[in-house]
């Protein structure tokens, strides 16, 4: 990496206070589980909404809450099944 580039690696603060690299695959797997067998919902829509609100060293607990909030914010008259995704994440 040259001096003109920013390091875009984000980190997660675990409950014990240690940090680790943010792993989008872990988030994706949780969302795949939460959306399994629910029609009319999209893992990528939840990821996009949540990604806007992520920041470096975010606590792991906040990521969980953010996924719930992101799914809940997608609930509408046309996409009511996000309520079931949010419920699974709780």
Labelled PLM ranges:
Residues 1-90:
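Long, C-terminal-biased catalytic regions of enzyme "large/alpha" subunits
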């Amino acid at each position: 990496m040259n001096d003109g580039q920013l390091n875009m690696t984000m980190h997660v603060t675990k409950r014990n206070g240690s940090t680790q690299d943010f792993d989008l695959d872990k988030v994706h797997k949780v969302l795949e589980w939460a959306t399994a067998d629910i029609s009319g919902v999209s893992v990528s829509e939840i990821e996009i909404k949540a990604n806007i609100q992520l920041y470096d060293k975010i606590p792991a607990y906040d990521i969980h809450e953010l996924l719930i909030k992101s799914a809940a914010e997608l609930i509408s008259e046309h996409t009511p099944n996000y309520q079931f995704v949010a419920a699974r994440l709780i």
